[in-house]
Amino acid sequence: MGHFTFFSRPQAMEIDAMAQQIYPSDSTPGAKEAQVIYFIDLALVTFAQDKQEIYKKGFGELSAKTGGKPLGSFPVDQQIALLTAIEDTPFFRIVRDHTIMGMFSAPQHGGNFRKIGWQQIGFDDSLNFRAPFGAYDKA
């Protein structure tokens, strides 16, 4: 894992473990391969600053459920059970939302590494509109 702006490294590992269960890798790449954690970290210091407190409180809630152990240290079935226990909390809901956003947002926002999410849904971004030069540039 690289550098984070909002998360500490242990916090990033917790969110990454959650994201991997929300959008797992199977026959197709998931949240880990799309590097969703970097999208979430960037979101929390830009457009989603108002969600920082939910994350801070949520780390405590998750730690209480895991007995202070990292979520990723548990077998997958236990991780799913632990996340199911908090799935109705604001913390889980926002991590889920941010995970999905990180899978399918434009890569320049930190997630969707190598356009993995777009490839899964067949989105071709080469057709994005760009205004032509010329009369549109004149005042």
Q: For the regions a protein language model found, what residue spans apply to each?
A:
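C-terminal segment of N-terminal export signals and the immediately downstream linker at the start
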Residues: 1-17
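Mature-region segments of soluble proteins
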Residues: 12-20, 35-139
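Zn2+-dependent metallopeptidase catalytic domains
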Residues: 29, 33-34
